[in-house]
Amino acid sequence: MPTDCISYQTSGYFSKLIQDYLDQKSELKTLYNHFPTLENFEKQIAEKASNFDNHNRIALVNTLKKQYQNIEISDSTKQNIELLALENTFTITTGHQLNLFSGPLYFLYKIISTINLTKELKSKYPSYNFVPVYWMATEDHDFEEINYFNFKGKKFRWNKESNGPVGRLSTEGLAEFLDIYSLELGSSTNANTLKKLFEDTYLKHDNLADATRFLANSLFANYGLVIIDADDADLKRAFIPYAKEELEKQTSYKAVQETIEQLKEYTVQVNPREINLFYIEDNLRERIIFEEDKYFVNNTKISFSKDQILSELENHPEKFSPNVIMRPLYQEIILPNLCYIGGGGEIAYWLELKSFFDAVNITFPMILVRNSVLLATEKQAKKADQLNLSWKDLFTKQENLVNAITHKISAFPIDLTPQKEILKTQFQYLYELAAQTDKSFSGAVKAQEVKQTKGLENLEKRLLKAQKRNLSDQLQRVIDLQCELFPNNSLQERQSNFSEFYLEKGEQLVPLLLQKLKPLEMNFNIITI
């Protein structure tokens, strides 16, 4: 194949907002702090160092040690946790939901982007330490988003009821799920490794948070990854003043609404609530609403006066859960973080938040679009070569691709533009004639031109359809290849689970990705495995 990457901007899978951000358009410059280049991290380090409350490092390290108590920990991860106590240590963070068996492939790419960036930063700034962090979205309550994964075109769903924060959800019932999934995996060495990984992850851990920590640790512990569950009372102590301001002043709502006004030319990713906090218990996560001088927990009978809710916050900060607007702030309060790495949708909502961070005097992190990858087998790459297709061709929407290939391989031109030009010339003569006679004739000429031009356009469409039928065998091979690489006409990384590729590559998969991906290059990578 002629190239192994294409730009995000030309891939066709990124919004105008993200494309303009990547192009560093001037109208977006007020919405972020520093654009993520290796050189710009020097400024970000200085700003975070002067703004971060280093007392929060103690709670952070103690909490992480507690959370890692019952898990085998690598020397590199153990060292990174200890390093977080030092004032010259900073984090690079990504976050992800607790998707069953990691969910879509981009789970890997997020974490690999994070690990690789810490390596690049250590090389550039050796007097500092950089720790890769995976923030587990344990407080999310939308179980339907995470209770399945796709494997070889089939959806494997865990049917279970859940209302509260998913991190606290029991893993009971996943033994039966594994029985069904195992049948699809087969009995190869790599298949047996995957079965054991699933079993050790979900059948030996009581809740989804512990299970997901084990899974991510199994895949990435050797690279120093630190996994955090922020659904924790000690960590939330540092968040109390900001949650208090949110309850009393609705600062985030006002600031984000102003930013959304700036973004009106784009699709807005997230709209803020007046209060961007939830109230949580084991089986409950509902919005806090302020009405008539009282605070209500939505869909419950729970209510508080102002004094009562502030007392509840002081005594039980773990019962207050930030939503998508407040969670980034919580993250930046408890972590000495320099950069958040996320997908296009995440970066879009981070771009709404800088004015809010400024209002509460917290340094806004750099925001980096994660690595995106298309994994292709050698057989698929060879097939693309035989069909004379570039990777850019394969990223084209299917209808457009089929039309373009039909034009390309047709034995004769399908484009009737020359005939349209001849027609236009003929009618030009008639218009000149019409100018010398009655106006009604000029109208008749115009009507006839429209009719005949439309007729040629219809013939052109019918000719294209006829050639598609005539070339159906060749076109079907193109369609089949694209469908293999883009399941459900979507990006592979949003559809397929890592286990599909682990079956082929086994333990080589993660090291291969770590070796190939460069976090700051911001290209869509095509990797042949």
Curated annotation (Swiss-Prot):
GO terms for molecular function: ligase activity. The keyword Coiled coil applies. Keywords: Coiled coil, Ligase. Residues 450-485 form a coiled coil. InterPro entries: Bacillithiol_biosynth_BshC, CC_BshC, Rossmann-like_BshC. It is an enzyme of class 6 (ligase). Its EC number is 6.-.-.-. It comes from the Bacteria. Belongs to the BshC family. This is Putative cysteine ligase BshC. It comes from Flavobacterium johnsoniae (strain ATCC 17061 / DSM 2064 / JCM 8514 / BCRC 14874 / CCUG 350202 / NBRC 14942 / NCIMB 11054 / UW101) (Cytophaga johnsonae). The lineage of its organism: Bacteria, Pseudomonadati, Bacteroidota, Flavobacteriia, Flavobacteriales.
